[in-house]
Amino acid sequence: MSSTSSHYRGDIDGLRFVSILLVVLYHAGVTRFGGGYVGVDVFFVISGYLITGLLLREYRSTGEINLVDFFARRIRRLLPLAATVLATTLVIGGWLLTPLQRTSLITDARWASLYGANWRFGAQTAEYTAVNPTESLLLHYWSLSIEEQFYVLWPLVVVIAFWAVRARGARLQTGLLLFVTAIIVAGSFAVAVANAIQLVPGSYFSSFGRFWEMGVGALLAIAAPSLQSLQTPRNRAPLVAIGLGAILVAAVSYGAQTPFPGYAALVPVLGTAMIIVFGANSSASAEPRSIDLLAWGPLPALGRLSYAWYLWHWPAIGIALLANQRWDLGLGTGVATFAAVAVSFGLAWISHHLIENPIRLAHRLSASTRPNFALGAALMLAPVIGGFLFLAAGNTGTTTVAAPAVITNDAPSSVAPSTTDAGNSRAPRTTPTTTAVAAPETSLVPTTLLVRAMTPEDAANDSVGQDRPALAMGACFSSFEDVEIAPDCVFGDENGERTIIAIGDSHMQHFLPALHLAGEENGWRVLSWIKGACPVTGASLWSNQLSRPFHECDEWNENLLAALEGVEADGVLIARAFQHQERLVDEDGQILEQPEGIAQAWAAGHRDVHDQLTERFGTVVVMRDTPRAPHNVANCLSRNPTETSQCGFPAEGHALRDTILFDAEVRAVGTQHHLDVTPYVCESDPCQMVTAGGVIKYRDTQHLTGTFSTTLAPVFSVLLEEAFFQTT
């Protein structure tokens, strides 16, 4: 937009500083800037504008676009610093993390080095607003990956558009490029909006769902000569202020619950567009750029550090929090975070002057393209090769704690009924007696359910995290978006004369291996329907995964109750996670925070479902939730393979954290049958996470491994026989 020989705009660098500051404040947990993630959207628009302007100027001055030279410049500009941060994070993070977390970090690094990090995190359906730096030290590479994908594809679009009408003149070439860009922007924006409305998991990281933001910047660069006429000395300052205000309003008013990107992304994107259009000093008569707010004083210089600061700040925060936790430094989370932010800014300044600029401006690299591509290949492949070597070296040093256990060795040798009727006060748990129950024969364990018992050494390669009940996956497990009831989910003895209905969320799912074996042994049919994060209740909940009220859970519960009207069974077993008390919402979809409101909402919802099921099936048994570990058990065991007791935790307190829900249920229905298997999950206090036979109990903080669940089959044989089939 400038007619001068220099195309540098200090206001854009100043805007870069504002953008990175918003991102850093958001990542630092400053609640006032809950929408600070829009800073990335500002970067996207700026990138599209600058890159397109660069390509157009080259074509207008030389009559061609040298793609080889373009990609060589991108390599010099982006890869050296990105690789430096990647390598530093791998070394320090690998030292601080558990072996299991280290494996995940190396995988993240491979994707980041190849600029596919957004696909990696999108495939994991990660929620950007729900991930903290300690969970993924390289999550921030998602945006760099999308930008690099744009940098690879966009020059090709420009070249093809210009080549297609090369004989028709510059005006038609520009018109065609403008038309093609508008089509891409419209299509990409439509995808982004559809993803936001449908809450498609992982869509935050979608490449095509983000290209429209860079496309808007490209449109501004293509239409720059025409847009200059919109400027006047009187409208520049107020319109730039409005654009900046739009960005800041989004940063302070958006949050984790904002469907993004979609319509909401228009605010920061259009705000950035206004700054780009009206911030340009297009004529000598316009006021000097020095009075522009974004070009004031140190802002442009700080903005030139934005790329380096963005790269350093996220892993710095994560490493600081990990170190504070590992060595118990006694620093508050806020202190550790802001210390890391300060350090990351220092690293940004140093690396900008010692790595980024020297390599970008190196005469030897700019004189020939070949060294640039050799450098780029080396920087991109180093983390990939290094990761493989690191994992290979780590696997050779794995320590075995115990041989894989035979399931019969870990099954309780004696089990006493612990189903209890609860009135207005919770009845005491029955102490185990000497009622003998034979452990299931090994032949009862299906090979699809259990290949072998997990041992602590498996924690180092995520075998524990993947030890899920295979028989409960697939069509019989409804995901977050599902509302239909799956047919024919039959476990246990399919021809059994007695039938138990087992329903609930993933905390029912982790009991299904035990129920399946108990059903086979005792001649019970077990009909099961499960939906992730969705308890069987008439109360409405918030979905952390979908970042909105969980309407699909409401609909699924309604469909489930309707489907059960045509089912014949001897009773219903319900299991659910205790943390649902943190997710109840009112009629307006607002999360309930007061215990009284939580209890009332849960009581009303439970009474509605309990009454319907009791009237239909007679006996309804609600399982108490199993203890929740204060740490990820698989991670802990991977760090302490020879000292597994370090991963135990006090069962009392954790085991009864569902008290609010349970007491509300009792008050709602007067009397409730409940079943508690905590004494068999935690035979001692602290609750140990590895059995005497070497079977790991938990695969994360709350879910039992499929292997350990099978060892509970004798327990369920006794408890369910007493609950559903014994007459008094």
Feature locations, PLM:
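Extracellular/periplasmic envelope-modification machinery, especially enzymes
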Residues: A256, N324-F338, F345-H353, N357-T728
